[in-house]
Amino acid sequence: PGAEHIYIGFPNRYVQERHPVASHAYPGVNDALFMASRDGVTWTRYLEAWVRPGLDQRNWTERNNYPIWGLMETAETEWSLLISEHYRQPDAPCRWRRLSLRPHGFVALHGEHAGGTCTTKPFTFGGRDLRLNFSTSAAGSVQVALLREDGAPIPGFGTADMPPLYGDQLDAPVAWSGGD
């Protein structure tokens, strides 16, 4: 929702050699990954699990944690994804669980206490306002600098020219003392 130029997917990963619930008759455990593409041909697949089995031991068996339906916008500030759980469990029926997600928060930087930097590939900004979707801890923050091709900040648009942003916002404007 809201970024139709980006394709996303949630492939399931099956690890057959793991059998964490010995009483379950079948080997293997599943989780789900996240992948994205801008053209539908070249994909980036993130190998860290995006949907994990969690604390419920009945989900640490094969054929669980499958995303069932595509991403759904369930509120202005929430997206939802349905996954399967309790597959082939003698004491519980198979069911769907709804996961609640932050809009556009799949691949994100974190404004952590220790700080850090991230430099994007060069791009031409064609808009009027630069806006961020971010979430920080109480001690963390986010700042943005506009850089020249040589990596130096454009005067008036460096991190020293803007107050740190902190909090939790889905569409926050970025402003520098050198202009907007």
What does each of the following model-derived ranges do?
Residues 1-180:
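Carbohydrate-active catalytic/glycan-binding domains of CAZyme proteins
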